[in-house]
Amino acid sequence: MQYAGLMGRFYVIADWVYKFSFANIIWLVFNIPIIFVLFNLLLADEIAVILVLFAMMLWLSPFVFFPSTIALFSVVNQFIKNEEVKLLSDFWGYYRGNYKKSMKIGAICTIFWAILIIDFFYVLELGNVVLTYVFIVLGFFALVYNLHIFSAAVNIDSKVRSLLKQVAIIMFGHPILSMSLGLLSLAFFYLITQWLTFLFPLFFGSILVFLSLLVFIKSYTNLELSRP
């Protein structure tokens, strides 16, 4: 049913709020194992326990976090295209249909992040300020690259190796847009964790995904138009 005037605007806003919040809740439910381990990791104070929980998170990520996050990107991509969405069934369909590809992407990204994080804490322990900042910058670029990978996985139909190469081209082909995404993502994360924590279970994932997709689609479209 379509509504006109003020009622129509209210209906559109309410519909988007419902879609974003429900999609985020579904994503969180699928990530319950990761959330449980992360919660215990934050509470842990013994190095042995921290290492075990960190290893568990790394092991779970390719099998749980990456497939569910790519499914969330797929659903939000439908929002952007104004396609009709059956949230739960579509989410499950994307999760199941892209599971193997998502797992491969997740394995590659998880190994990279594990090496980066371990090296960062090693350098931090050494007290090398210059290298510490180098790793922080590398982490920032890795964050942007990872967000672009998620977006590319639902917009570009290609094998994983080719996908990773195309993402690098898109990212460095439009550095301002890409860096803006990184800064915006960090600002949004700070805002919702420090000031708007009550919105975290409803909008954190879905809004961040929405912003990532908008930037990626803009960058990808510009790149395609610039080709002869």
Predicted regions and their residues:
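Generic alpha-helical transmembrane segments
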Residues: 136-146
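Helix-coil boundary and N-terminal low-complexity module in membrane systems
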Residues: 1-117, 121, 128-131, 145-147, ...
